[in-house]
């Protein structure tokens, strides 16, 4: 590549020093795209298609510069001209193509597939406004469209286009590609995003409301449109079918271009179904193969040998079940195929629990994936065992050979090199760079001789990252935080099973404790980040409580110097890259058995935070790796929780009556909080906790408070705390997504 200075002069007709940050960003965007364009596509005979409703890719400039090996040179050229790459990157808008862990995992995975030199593309939709932009106003979440698409972007319009048939009309798609360069190798893959030229943002009314019936104009406007009514559910089906029909046609076209006769399609393609949203790819592939003259039996056999399903949840609400009549209304041409798939299952298995179409005429997408795919994987060891022994036991009894575990991972290029360059460079200095390609080499930190020097440096790095976060929050939200406080952080989408409400009850405990004269050894800053689905009322209520507590504490001069609560507005990948390196206490407090894996826990661990968590998801594997003395575990285990559910034995009212719990829950509807908040919202959350509490907040609350208090006390022994930090960073290598993807390939995909 030519120098950046020459490129800027050629394209902007001025030097780097003379450019604004906006001009430099456009120049750098195109410079980076040009460098990526020079990489060859991976061209193995067999290709994985990772189909997902979400790809939470984050800003791409620095990430792509790192993978292309250009980051240090570009940073220096900018610096020599008096410019700062971080300030230039501020101009970039974060792509709004995902929401939570599902989408971030997909982004890490396509990065790792490329970096391992495997042939594989992500396939999804190009949402114009993503989920939504979160605005915190009047102590509540408000939603507005998240406009991220600009004329100059990472998207490259492809010449490919497909006809997608629906019941009453056909839509013509447009395909956009985003290059995914591998880390310091000569090849790349792509993220393929389908869209519609007819989509029209003018139909959006107030907030994120829009006409859900005008499919040609609304189809790719938003990720996860509100499905609390019939029209919203139908729109989800339109979206999902548009994604998989385009994906299936792309798969067949590319296989034919490589020489497939379609009878051998499984030699050319393997489809990884990421959660149940892309499940209709199975009947759609069967439809396309039979249309091309392949018999039904053979078409089913081909598709069964090329589709694999990743289960991401044991929450029944998230395992999609669509009314057959809705499918008949949207995609009637798929219904006979789905009915035939169900008929074959019924002919072989009498257990109603494994049928695809249930007695209420609902189509169970996960059931179709399991019967008509060759692999079913969970995403953490505990999660996979729960699937086999409980949630999907009826299927495991039929197909034990299909079930396997692939513990999730994260890309260290995004979450260490990019998010925490100070720590990354220090690890390079003392360990060398082997860990860039083999993350297990981080274990060498354990045997590094000068432990005192390492601890002193880790203290300095953490302090530096806290100041960086403080500046970020001041600039983006006008909030000032104390960089000398303990940073206690819970960042993830708002859901009752993730139990942000339990953390809020701890905040109440601490507030009342300080009011009673028990001053903590040092100030504590409790940081929350996450969005609540617009139709998820209780999740909105939890955000409201957190914001009310923030106001009550800030306005209390006896407490404010010692405790602060901050809800980070519009939490996204960019915010995470500031929050994670600055964190001391990583909150991973889901009800045991409910979190499939989690990946935030891995990012925090890698960046030197200690985990406060239940024995749930990947916390179990973190605990096994670091040892009980280097993690803070509380709460009931998954077996106990599952048993309580089966026997309907948990009564929140009994726990509410306890002396240690009642004052905390009552404080939600105290005069102080009601003065800051909405009575209806606060009373609804209060009643939910004492009368229902489906995710057993009060069951674990006392132990949570006890262990968290122990953690705060342990923090004051800096030497012992830093010993734990070193162990956590050293053992994080297992959670590299490169390791996860290598296992997917070895056990499932079998790519060259």
Regions found by a protein language model. Give the residues of each.
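A conserved ligand/cofactor-binding region detector
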Residues: 1-752
């Amino acid at each position: 590549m030519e120098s950046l200075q020459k490129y800027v002069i050629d394209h902007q007709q001025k030097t780097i020093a003379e450019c604004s940050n906006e001009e430099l960003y456009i120049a750098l965007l195109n410079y980076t795209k040009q460098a990526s364009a020079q990489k060859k596509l991976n061209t193995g005979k067999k290709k994985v298609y990772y189909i997902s409703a979400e790809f939470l890719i984050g800003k791409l400039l620095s990430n792509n510069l790192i993978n292309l090996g250009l980051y240090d040179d570009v940073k220096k050229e900018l610096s020599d001209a008096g410019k700062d790459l971080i300030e230039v990157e501020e101009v970039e808008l974060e792509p709004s193509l995902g929401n939570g862990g599902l989408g971030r995992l997909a982004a890490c995975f396509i990065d790792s597939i490329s970096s391992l030199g495997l042939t594989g593309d992500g396939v999804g939709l190009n949402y114009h406004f993503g989920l939504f932009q979160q605005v915190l106003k009047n102590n509540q979440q408000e939603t507005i469209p998240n406009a991220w698409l600009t004329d100059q972007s990472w998207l490259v319009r492809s010449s490919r286009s497909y006809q997608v048939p629906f019941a009453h009309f056909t839509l013509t798609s447009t395909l956009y590609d985003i290059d995914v360069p591998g880390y310091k190798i000569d090849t790349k893959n792509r993220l393929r995003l389908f869209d519609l030229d007819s989509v029209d943002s003018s139909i959006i009314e107030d907030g994120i409301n829009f006409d859900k019936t005008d499919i040609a104009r609304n189809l790719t406007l938003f990720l996860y449109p509100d499905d609390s009514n019939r029209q919203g559910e139908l729109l989800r089906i339109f979206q999902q079918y548009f994604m998989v029909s385009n994906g299936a046609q792309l798969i067949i076209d590319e296989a034919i271009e490589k020489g497939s006769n379609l009878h051998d399609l499984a030699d050319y393609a393997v489809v990884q179904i990421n959660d149940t949203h892309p499940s209709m790819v199975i009947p759609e592939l069967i439809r396309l193969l039979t249309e091309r003259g392949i018999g039904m039996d053979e078409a089913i056999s081909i598709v069964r040998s090329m589709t694999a399903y990743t289960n991401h949840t044991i929450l029944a609400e998230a395992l999609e079940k669509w009314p057959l009549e809705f499918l008949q209304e949207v995609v009637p041409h798929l219904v006979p195929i789905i009915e035939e798939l169900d008929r074959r299952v019924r002919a072989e298995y009498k257990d109603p629990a494994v049928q695809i179409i249930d007695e209420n005429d609902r189509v169970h997408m996960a059931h179709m994936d399991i019967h008509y795919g060759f692999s079913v994987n969970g995403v953490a060891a505990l999660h996979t065992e729960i699937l086999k022994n409980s949630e999907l036991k009826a299927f495991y009894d039929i197909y034990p050979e299909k079930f396997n575990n692939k513990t999730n991972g994260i890309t260290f290029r995004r979450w260490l090199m990019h998010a925490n360059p100070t720590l990354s460079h220090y690890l390079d200095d003392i360990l060398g760079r082997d860990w860039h390609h083999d993350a297990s080499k981080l274990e060498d930190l354990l045997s590094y001789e000068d432990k005192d020097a390492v601890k002193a440096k880790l203290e300095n790095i953490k302090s530096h990252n806290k100041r960086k976060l403080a500046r970020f929050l001041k600039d983006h939200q006008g909030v000032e935080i104390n960089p000398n406080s303990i940073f206690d952080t819970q960042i993830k989408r708002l859901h009752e099973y993730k139990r942000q409400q339990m953390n809020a009850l701890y905040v109440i405990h601490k507030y009342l404790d300080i009011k009673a004269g028990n001053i903590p050894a040092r100030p504590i800053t409790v940081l929350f980040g996450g969005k609540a689905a617009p139709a998820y009322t209780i999740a909105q209520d939890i955000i409201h409580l957190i914001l009310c507590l923030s106001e009550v504490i800030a306005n209390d001069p006896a407490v404010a110097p010692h405790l602060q609560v901050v809800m980070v507005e519009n939490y996204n990948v960019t915010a995470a890259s500031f929050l994670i390196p600055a964190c001391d206490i990583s909150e991973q407090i889901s009800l045991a058995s409910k979190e499939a894996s989690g990946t935030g826990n891995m990012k925090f661990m890698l960046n030197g935070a200690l985990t406060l968590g239940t024995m749930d998801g990947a916390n179990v594997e973190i605990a096994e790796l670091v040892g009980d003395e280097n993690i803070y575990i509380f709460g009931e285990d998954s077996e106990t929780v599952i048993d309580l559910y089966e026997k309907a034995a948990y009564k929140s009212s009994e726990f509410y009556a306890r002396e240690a719990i009642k004052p905390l829950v009552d404080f939600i509807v105290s005069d102080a909080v009601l003065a800051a908040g909405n009575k209806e919202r606060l009373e609804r959350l209060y009643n939910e906790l004492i009368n229902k509490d489906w995710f057993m907040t009060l069951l674990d609350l006392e132990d949570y408070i006890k262990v968290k208090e122990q953690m705060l006390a342990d923090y004051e022994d800096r030497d012992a705390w830093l010993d734990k930090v070193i162990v956590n960073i050293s053992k994080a290598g297992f959670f590299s997504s490169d390791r996860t993807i290598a296992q997917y390939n070895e056990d499932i995909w079998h790519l060259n």
